[in-house]
Amino acid sequence: MQQPMVEFKNVIKKYDDNQILKGIDMALEKGKFYTLLGPSGCGKTTILRIIAGFTNASSGDVLFEGKRMNDLPANKRQVNTVFQDYALFPHLNVFDNVAFGLNLRKVKKSDVEKKVIEALKLVRLGGYEHREISELSGGQQQRVAIARALANEPKVLLLDEPLSALDMKLRKAMQYELRDLQQRLGITFLFVTHDQEEALAMSDEIFVMNEGNVLQSGTPVDIYDEPINHFVADFIGESNILPGKMVADYQVEIVGKVFECADAGMKPNEAVEIVLRPEDLDIVAVNQGQLVVTVDTQLFRGDYYEITAYDDDRNRWLIHSTNPAKDGQQVGLFFEPEDVHVMRFGESEEDFDARLESYEEED
């Protein structure tokens, strides 16, 4: 494994008696797109501020390319930040906004012009040098803010919820732009968001956070398909989460029935939680279903119907189907063993990863 670009070792951050970060361990490699994902107040922006040098860790080590940088001033770090509100100067034109950091560093005028033009070309705003900020759309203003950060040639770009102020269509377009930009530049991006769709769409790796802890890290596919606990399963996409009991390896009891699953290595009769994603549930005839449910409501979402149904024990089931159903209709539900994800209570990420690796070795 290559040396991490940024590394946290047991980083704790306190404000008086309030512990914001509770022993964070994480590593960011060169040239990858990382996302800190979690609800408001979970500590994700605090991590960004510590990396940028805007605040200090209360304890623990923050390393940059293997060197401790806890006490390194913000202006000495090869890091730049794009803020949620872009922090552009309305009285300066595009060129002067992008050049602002370079001028503070007293970069030669000829080099400033070259770096500004290159940065604007990177974000596809070549020729916009003399535009006023007020003449730009929200997406263009965001790209100016990114160009200003890139003009300083950082090794790590920090992005603090930069898409949150944009409308949905523009936000999705900017997801493509940011991902493409990161791949073209080959530098490390660390993106902060509470929007799981943004995280899944753009990231090489996601850190899911809650209450000052990193609960799970991994690729978007790994975290979506194999959530470690109830919080992650519920926060990453929509889920049916039900109590269950392991009967034996590859067999689990849900709603009083035994189903095949892809999980093993647990104690017989161990209490667990089960995740079934709505898109993995197929509506079939009642006599072909593994479960029978009664349709309660449905909403048309454009490319699928979101159907809410209940079984005889009043367990709620969320189903995503391309075919509509009728309110009050009884239908069967069918799913494959690999669609059943079993979560253990209190399992550490290390033990969880080891369990998943053991399945792969068996295959």
UniProtKB/Swiss-Prot annotation:
Keyword NAD assigned to the entry: answer is no
Kindly state which reaction or reactions the protein catalyses: ATP + H2O + polyamine-[polyamine-binding protein]Side 1 = ADP + phosphate + polyamineSide 2 + [polyamine-binding protein]Side 1
Residues at which ATP binds: G38, P39, S40, G41, C42, G43, K44, T45
Any S-S bridges, and between which cysteines? none
Q: Which UniProt keywords apply?
A: ATP-binding, Cell membrane, Membrane, Nucleotide-binding, Translocase, Transport
- What GO terms are given for molecular function? ABC-type putrescine transporter activity; ATP binding; ATP hydrolysis activity
List the Pfam families hit by this protein, alphabetically.
ABC_tran (PF00005), TOBE_2 (PF08402)
Spans through the membrane: none
Q: What is its EC number?
A: 7.6.2.11
Q: What range(s) does the ABC transporter domain occupy? A: 6-236
Q: How does it sit in the membrane?
A: Peripheral membrane protein
Q: State the oligomer form and interacting partners.
A: The complex is composed of two ATP-binding proteins (PotA), two transmembrane proteins (PotB and PotC) and a solute-binding protein (PotD).
Record's function text? Part of the ABC transporter complex PotABCD involved in spermidine/putrescine import. Responsible for energy coupling to the transport system.
For this chain, the family text in UniProt reads: Belongs to the ABC transporter superfamily. Spermidine/putrescine importer (TC 3.A.1.11.1) family.
Q: What is this protein called?
A: Spermidine/putrescine import ATP-binding protein PotA
Species source reads Latilactobacillus sakei subsp. sakei (strain 23K)
| Gene (UniProt) | potA
